[in-house]
Amino acid sequence: MQYRNDKYGNPISVLGFGCMRFDKKGGKIEFEKAEKEILAAYEAGVNYYDTAYIYGGSEEFLGEVFEKNGLRDKVKIATKLPHYLIKNMEGIEKTFAEELRRLRTDYVDYYLMHMLTDVKTWERLKSHGIEEWIR
């Protein structure tokens, strides 16, 4: 696996693992199959896993797999703020706290804005205090 360093010098695999579409049965992620996929990627050198609040159980699944296999401190997790669900600062804080709970961690490595495509949306988030919250 090839790696690039982030701005803090942390090596990040050039291939990340997107966690949007795990196979499901009866609306639930097929745990054993998806866990094998995550572990195979990790064994191949992948250390960057991308999930999101709206990815249908993905955060909970990833948190469980990393906890069960002792991987949390060995990987980097990116998840996303669903800005379209945010109405105020309390919504930002509540959503982030829920993501931490789902991921079974007290931090995420990279927190992204999900589908932020225009200046108007960014201005709305700024009016809720997102810049101060990020700092």
Kindly give the residue locations of the regions a language model identified.
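Acidic active-site catalytic centers that drive phospho-/nucleotidyl reactions
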Residues: 50, 80, 106-109
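Glycine/proline-rich, positively charged
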Residues: 39, 87-135
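Generic beta-strand or strand-like secondary-structure segments
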Residues: 61-64, 80, 91-98
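A short, structured active-site edge motif that brings together acidic residues
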Residues: 73-85, 111-116
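N-terminal binding-site loop/beta-alpha segment at the start of enzyme catalytic domains
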Residues: 1-75
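Active-site mouth loops of central-metabolism enzymes
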Residues: 20-33, 80-91, 119-123
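Short alpha-helix boundary/capping motifs
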Residues: 69-70, 78, 127-128
